[in-house]
Amino acid sequence: MNGTEGPNFYVPFSNATGVVRSPFEYPQYYLAEPWQFSMLAAYMFLLIVLGFPINFLTLYVTVQHKKLRTPLNYILLNLAVADLFMVFGGFTTTLYTSLHGYFVFGPTGCNAEGFFATLGGEIALWSLVVLAIERYVVVCKPMSNFRFGENHAIMGVAFTWVMALACAAPPLFGWSRYIPEGLQCSCGIDYYTLKPEVNNESFVIYMFVVHFTIPMIVIFFCYGQLVFTVKEARAQQQESATTQKAEKEVTRMVIIMVIAFLICWVPYASVAFYIFTHQGSNFGPIFMTIPAFFAKSASIYNPVIYIMMNKQFRNCMLTTICCGKNPLGDDEASATVSKTETSQVAPA
């Protein structure tokens, strides 16, 4: 084995020279230079400074403007709530531990940080699944004049939390475990060991199949069908130009969210899968640290995409920030096409 396993940790560094110490008790400066830990802390500080205001503003603006409280926006707000969980439950912890060079909060703090990070990531993934299904049902119309209403949105939000908890909670109750990863300053699922005492192998397989592969299959299926439907509708001119443009803009926004999710999380998932399927292989702490910390940037991109691509929300946000006046002078009529709500279109 090229790493050192302890009772509740796995350090990707051989203890042949006797330098490895528990990441819960001692600085891990034998893994990297102190300045590298400081860089991680600076990165986490940046994510907090950007992540909290933009996600909080997303929630606040929606509460202030009734016109934004559409069913589809419930799912988008769910993403903002999940991001805030990551900011407060994970980022603040990782910032503090990076400044100290080890996970100072012990195994209990590791469980909390790992739980919030996993919960936030899974809520985001399952929210994208719900959005993909919504786009498929509304645009492809397999159920005729189906309209995505408030009850559907509430059920969708509840579904994302149930599925996310089904992934994030088991390690807290003895099925798998959360341990420090990479430079030992943040925590995640144990991909490093089989750990039969906690049935770790079965949990990791369950996680990759149920909470990553299946959601990806659903998302790609929905958007694959959607592309064909949009092409047919365009060729036959079955819907009004305004309706087509509105549906196209919403669909494009959600697709960009999916692409951004893949960019942030696929490197982490790929490295985790490699580590799990190559037990005992030789890899350094940076190998997992970079994708793990890069994945944390996911807390920023969803609200940024939403603000950039939804003109109505952008106008409402500027009005809120500027105390009731929009400096751009855009009226609501110009934003009608960009409203993030589903239209009820006659079936093909």
Curated annotation (Swiss-Prot):
Q: Which UniProt keywords apply?
A: Acetylation, Cell projection, Chromophore, Disulfide bond, G-protein coupled receptor, Glycoprotein, Lipoprotein, Membrane, Metal-binding, Palmitate, Phosphoprotein, Photoreceptor protein, Receptor, Retinal protein, Sensory transduction, Transducer, Transmembrane, Transmembrane helix, Vision, Zinc
Region spans: Interaction with SAG? 330-348
Asked if the record carries the keyword Metal-binding, the reply is: yes
Please provide, in alphabetical order, the Gene Ontology terms of the cellular component aspect for this entry.
membrane; photoreceptor disc membrane; photoreceptor inner segment membrane; photoreceptor outer segment membrane; plasma membrane
Q: How is it modified after translation?
A: Phosphorylated on some or all of the serine and threonine residues present in the C-terminal region. Contains one covalently linked retinal chromophore. Upon light absorption, the covalently bound 11-cis-retinal is converted to all-trans-retinal. After hydrolysis of the Schiff base and release of the covalently bound all-trans-retinal, active rhodopsin is regenerated by binding of a fresh molecule of 11-cis-retinal.
Q: Which residues are reported to carry the modification N-acetylmethionine? A: M1
Chief place where the protein resides: membrane
MF terms in GO? 11-cis retinal binding; G protein-coupled photoreceptor activity; metal ion binding
Listed GO biological process terms: absorption of visible light; G protein-coupled opsin signaling pathway; G protein-coupled receptor signaling pathway; visual perception
Sites marked Plays an important role in the conformation switch to the active conformation:
E113
Give the residue spans that cross the bilayer: 37-61, 74-96, 111-133, 153-173, 203-224, 253-274, 287-308
Q: Which residues are glycosylated?
A: N2, N15
Q: Which residues lie on this side of the membrane: Cytoplasmic?
A: 62-73, 134-152, 225-252, 309-348
N6-(retinylidene)lysine found at: K296
Lipid link (S-palmitoyl cysteine) located at? Answer: C322, C323
Topology check: give the Extracellular ranges: 1-36, 97-110, 174-202, 275-286
Q: Please tell me where Zn(2+) binds in this chain.
A: E201, Q279
Give all cystine bridges in this chain.
Answer: C110-C187
Q: What does this protein do?
A: Photoreceptor required for image-forming vision at low light intensity. Required for photoreceptor cell viability after birth. Light-induced isomerization of 11-cis to all-trans retinal triggers a conformational change that activates signaling via G-proteins. Subsequent receptor phosphorylation mediates displacement of the bound G-protein alpha subunit by the arrestin SAG and terminates signaling.
Its family remark reads: Belongs to the G-protein coupled receptor 1 family. Opsin subfamily.
Q: How does it assemble?
A: Homodimer. May form a complex composed of RHO, GRK1 and RCVRN in a Ca(2+)-dependent manner; RCVRN prevents the interaction between GRK1 and RHO. Interacts with GRK1. Interacts (phosphorylated form) with SAG. Interacts with GNAT1. Interacts with GNAT3. SAG and G-proteins compete for a common binding site. Interacts with PRCD; the interaction promotes PRCD stability. Forms a complex with ASAP1 and ARF4. Forms a complex with ASAP1, RAB11A, Rabin8/RAB3IP, ARF4 and RAB11FIP3; the complex regulates Golgi-to-cilia rhodopsin/RHO transport in photoreceptors.
- Protein name, entry field: Rhodopsin
Q: Tell me what gene encodes this.
A: RHO
